[in-house]
Amino acid sequence: YLLLIDNDIYRSFYAVEYLKPIFSIYYRRDNMTSAFWRKHAPRLEPRLCQKSNLVVANSPQLAKAVQTYNQYSFDIGQGVDLSNYNTNNSYQLPKDMENIPRPIIGYVGWVTSRRLDANLLYQVALRCPQYSFVMVGGEDDFFKKHPLHSLSNVHFLGQKKQIETISYMSHFDVCMNPQLVNEITIGNYPRKVDEYLALGKPVIATKTLTMDLFTGYVWNCLGAEEYIQAINEALIPTSSDIIKKRIEFAHTHTWENSINKLYSYINI
């Protein structure tokens, strides 16, 4: 049988020795940077890569980072379930968006200072009072106390159920992913970008190595000036062909495609 270790460094460190599979795979889908992992993961993960027959990751950056420990380290992409994202559906406007002026620049996801650039958002929103900035998701303490809350054109709508977030996205005029660039996000695969694109939405995002995969389908930005320029461009009405291409591109990131790549690297 095959053994697949899904980023489980501690509990699975001796799994190869105990289970004796004919082929072992270590799946690396995140930089393990939290306090729980920080003490031992930098020492153990390279050794786990070395003892595995194959290492796969969901982004080029995460694969490249461990190639010195295992030459058989490859990016297999990220599978995303987009079955509920359908532009033919008529999604009802959420009640807490009814009185928000348009155009709306929106984000869906955890609103955390570990991943999002609050100061960038503040600069952009401050300089663009004609736009509404909507954040859908639970906030950490940093964001709860941030001056963003003092801006009348910034709206924090709180955490929603996953199935509800589609309605919010569908009523954004532009979708955004204003990430910080740090050890967590530099190789992180942004599944929400695929969700945005699956609805045909124009997307602006912070430029990272992984976001290069989306070149030609999103606006990749660095700094407030580029973000503001991208928002202005993204709000210009576009053709149905471009919308269709966004949707089609998002649907290339399927679990089927990811697993097919995985199988192509398994050599038994």
Label the model's feature ranges:
Residues 143-169:
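Nucleotide-activated donor-binding/catalytic signature segment of Leloir-type glycosyltransferases, i.e.
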Residues 217-225, 233-239:
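Conserved acidic donor-binding segment of nucleotide-sugar-dependent glycosyltransferases
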Residues 239-267:
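A charged, aromatic-enriched C-terminal amphipathic alpha-helix characteristic of glycosyltransferases
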